[in-house]
């Protein structure tokens, strides 16, 4: 359950009003309320800056820079004035830093381009931030105006017009028929439609995903320096565009498809919908793509698999999606579990150990036992094959790997006492039916009688074996008591002889 959060606005209606002030529905609005929106955000800040979300504050700061630019333009001041450029640069730098700094939670610094790719922020914002911070000359005014407009558009798409806000508002106004938004069933239908289109597009682009792996395997985008914004390379732009038009178009389509997956995954209430759709159309390549590009997809998919596996093991009359796609344990192990484990990032596994530990505790099974054993072996292999200078550095620091390995070993010991390879035979024994819930077959009385006879014979045989074992133990104990215990003594007049000679 998500804990409640203190916000400076009274209700969602007030936030909706602020949104309309920042982003009027029509540009020809008679009364421009952007200045009033900036003032309202300033009043929110007086209530406590810790309660004000960064995206709201950043929207106000960028809008303030835009208003200052428009004001000086109306007064006829020189267009390339330093105060306006500094105002734009500072607002954009704070915009980027406020988005990326909270995601910098690793033990070692992660490149900002990687963090930007995870949240869907275009990489050129990172380069513009670097240019405004470290370069000798500030970016041009036209470039800054365009960047501010793009930043406001990004904030609108990822926050102000986010469906999660609509979900929260609809929860409060569930019985309201005023025409705002659409009901949850309609949302699910539209979500499923978008999910189906995204999946179909991925199927069409599968060959491109195989050919241009570097686009989705490496989150780092190519750096853009200040020369990219100066216009010096525009002379050869058409030639370069014709030369690599196919590659650039494929790269664009791949990035667009990844962005669609990320937008769908942002709504946590539909995670199970995405996972069910994914497993109904299972592809190892798509699994790798989503694990590398969707936040928390790795442990979410393991959690879904573990729950499906336990449901299948607990009730043999139910055929889960997992059983229909992977009928035998070896198939499940090679085509799914090993793919997940091989593509699981060890650093992410350590950083999010709390999530993994909770998953292991709540979904105990032989599948989780296999997962723990494989991850322990993977972590130990990484420790052996790591670079020497990294190992020296790790010795000086408190490394959480030792603690995680100890907990994994403890979980393995506990799970080994409860589960064994007999679960594999049970999983293989259950047939994969087409129907999700097959009908129970009635057993004939004759078959019941035969079964009871067999079970009775087995019980009597077990009793005889146990009684025979107790008798054998008693006989051995009596023999041991009958034979006296003698101490070792040296043999007198012993002469060594060759083997075979008496």
Curated annotation (Swiss-Prot):
Coiled coil: none annotated. Its main location: nucleus. GO terms for cellular component: cytoplasm; Las1 complex; mitochondrion; nucleolus; nucleus; preribosome, large subunit precursor. It comes from the Eukaryota. Pfam families: Las1 (PF04031). GO terms for biological process: cleavage in ITS2 between 5.8S rRNA and LSU-rRNA of tricistronic rRNA transcript (SSU-rRNA, 5.8S rRNA, LSU-rRNA); maturation of 5.8S rRNA; maturation of LSU-rRNA. Signal peptide: none annotated. One of its GO terms (molecular function) is endonuclease activity. Residues 469-489 are annotated as: Disordered. It is found in: Nucleus; Mitochondrion. Keywords: Mitochondrion, Nucleus. Belongs to the LAS1 family. Regulates cell surface growth, bud formation and morphogenesis. May act indirectly by regulating factor(s) involved in these processes. Present with 647 molecules/cell in log phase SD medium. PANTHER family: RIBOSOMAL BIOGENESIS PROTEIN LAS1L (PTHR15002:SF0). This is Protein LAS1. It comes from Saccharomyces cerevisiae (strain ATCC 204508 / S288c) (Baker's yeast). The lineage of its organism: Eukaryota, Fungi, Dikarya, Ascomycota, Saccharomycotina.
């Amino acid at each position: 359950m998500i804990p409640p959060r203190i916000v400076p606005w009274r209700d969602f209606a007030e936030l909706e009003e602020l949104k309309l002030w920042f982003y009027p529905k029509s540009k020809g609005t008679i009364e421009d309320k952007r200045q009033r929106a900036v003032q309202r955000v300033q009043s929110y800040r007086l209530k406590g800056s810790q309660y004000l979300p960064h995206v709201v504050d950043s929207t106000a700061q960028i809008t303030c820079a835009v208003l200052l630019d428009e004001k000086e333009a109306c007064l006829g001041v020189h267009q390339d004035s330093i105060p306006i450029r500094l105002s734009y640069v500072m607002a954009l730098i704070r915009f980027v830093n406020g988005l990326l700094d909270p995601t910098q939670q690793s033990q070692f610094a992660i490149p900002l381009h990687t963090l930007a790719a995870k949240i869907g922020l275009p990489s050129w914002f990172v380069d513009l931030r670097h240019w405004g911070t470290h370069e000798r000359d500030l970016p041009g005014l036209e470039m800054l105006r365009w960047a501010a407009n793009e930043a406001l558009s990004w904030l609108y798409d990822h926050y102000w017009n986010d469906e999660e806000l609509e979900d929260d508002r609809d929860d409060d106004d569930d019985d309201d028929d005023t025409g705002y938004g659409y009901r949850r069933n309609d949302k699910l239908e539209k979500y499923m439609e978008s999910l189906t289109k995204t999946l179909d597009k991925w199927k069409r682009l599968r060959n491109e995903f195989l050919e241009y792996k570097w686009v989705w395997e490496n989150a780092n985008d190519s750096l853009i320096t200040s020369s990219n914004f100066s216009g010096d390379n525009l002379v050869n732009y058409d030639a370069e565009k014709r030369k690599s038009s196919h590659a650039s178009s494929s790269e664009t389509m791949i990035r667009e498809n990844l962005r669609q997956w990320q937008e769908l995954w942002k709504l946590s209430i539909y995670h199970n919908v995405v996972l069910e759709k994914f497993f109904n159309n299972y592809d190892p390549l798509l699994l790798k793509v989503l694990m590398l590009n969707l936040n928390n997809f790795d442990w979410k998919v393991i959690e879904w698999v573990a729950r499906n596996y336990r449901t299948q093991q607990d009730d043999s009359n139910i055929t889960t999606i997992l059983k229909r796609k992977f009928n035998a344990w070896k198939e499940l192990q090679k085509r799914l579990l090993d793919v997940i484990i091989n593509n699981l990032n060890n650093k992410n596994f350590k950083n999010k150990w709390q999530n993994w530990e909770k998953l292991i505790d709540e979904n105990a099974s032989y599948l989780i036992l296999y997962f723990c054993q494989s991850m322990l072996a993977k972590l130990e292999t990484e420790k052996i094959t790591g670079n020497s200078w990294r190992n020296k550095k790790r010795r000086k620091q408190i490394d959480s790997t030792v603690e995680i390995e100890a907990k994994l070993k403890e979980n393995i010991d506990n799970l080994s006492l409860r589960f064994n390879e007999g679960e594999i035979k049970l999983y293989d024994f259950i047939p994969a039916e087409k129907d999700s819930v097959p009908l129970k077959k009635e057993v004939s009385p004759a078959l019941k009688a035969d079964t009871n006879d067999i079970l009775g014979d087995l019980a009597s045989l077990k009793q005889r074996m146990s009684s025979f074992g107790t008798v054998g133990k008693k006989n051995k104990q009596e023999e041991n008591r009958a034979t006296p215990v003698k101490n070792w003594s040296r043999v007198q007049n012993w002469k060594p002889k060759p083997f075979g000679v008496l």
